[in-house]
Each structure stands twice: as C-alpha cells, then as structure tokens.
Swiss-Prot record:
Name this polypeptide is given: Aspartyl/glutamyl-tRNA(Asn/Gln) amidotransferase subunit C
EC number assigned by the record: 6.3.5.-
InterPro entries xref list: Asp/Glu-ADT_sf_sub_c (IPR036113), GatC (IPR003837)
Described purpose of this protein according to its UniProt entry: Allows the formation of correctly charged Asn-tRNA(Asn) or Gln-tRNA(Gln) through the transamidation of misacylated Asp-tRNA(Asn) or Glu-tRNA(Gln) in organisms which lack either or both of asparaginyl-tRNA or glutaminyl-tRNA synthetases. The reaction takes place in the presence of glutamine and ATP through an activated phospho-Asp-tRNA(Asn) or phospho-Glu-tRNA(Gln).
Listed GO MF terms: asparaginyl-tRNA synthase (glutamine-hydrolyzing) activity; ATP binding; glutaminyl-tRNA synthase (glutamine-hydrolyzing) activity
Species lineage: Bacteria, Bacillati, Actinomycetota, Actinomycetes, Mycobacteriales
This protein's record includes keyword Transferase: no
Gene Ontology BP terms: glutaminyl-tRNAGln biosynthesis via transamidation; regulation of translational fidelity; translation
Stored Pfam families: GatC (PF02686)
Length: 99
C-alpha cells in the first residue's frame, strides 16, 4: 500500500515552491514511497544496547588557518553583477517596509 499520495507530493512541491509536471508528481510519489519503505525497514532494527551518538567522528571544530590571501577587488567582484548601486550589489526588495 502506498504511504504517500500524489496529492501529498503536490502539496510538498507547493510548500517548496517547485513547479512539477504530472509525470514528475507520479515519479516523485513512487520514489518517496520507496524511501519511506526503506525508513520503515530501518525503524524495525533492534538497537537495544547501541549507544546513541550525534557524530561518530572525534574531530570537533576543525578550522582552516586564518591566513590573509589575495582576493577580488570591489570592481572585479561587481563586474558580472546585473545591477549595482554605489559600489554594492543591488537586489530586488523581498521584505516590505514594515518588516
């Protein structure tokens, strides 16, 4: 029995702002159903006595050295920008005035 319907995939696509065709909805419904089936199998595994871990690796907060290196000039960085304003990238407003 299917665990996820085509309508549920369409709803998820709307939430993610994805425009999916009918064939994509059908395809993704099948793929997500298979994934949920695998998750169901994993949930049946007996993990009694297995210590919970958040990260199996012992490396914590590994950073690269903070070394100054050559980079682009402001002009080079803005050269391919479609729109600039006073030496900055200009992008469309996404939030209203009150926000």
């Amino acid at each position: 029995m299917s665990q996820i319907s085509r309508d549920e995939v369409a709803h998820l696509a709307r939430l993610a702002r994805l425009a999916l065709t009918d064939s994509e909805l059908d395809s993704f419904a099948g793929q997500l159903d298979a994934i949920l089936g695998h998750v169901g199998q994993i949930q049946t595994v007996d993990v009694t006595g297995v210590e919970a871990t958040g990260n199996p690796l012992k490396d914590v907060n590994v950073f690269r050295p903070d070394v100054e290196a050559p980079s682009l000039t402001q002009e080079q960085a803005l050269a391919a920008a479609p729109n600039t304003d006073e030496g900055r990238f200009a992008v469309p407003r996404i939030l209203g005035e009150a926000e």
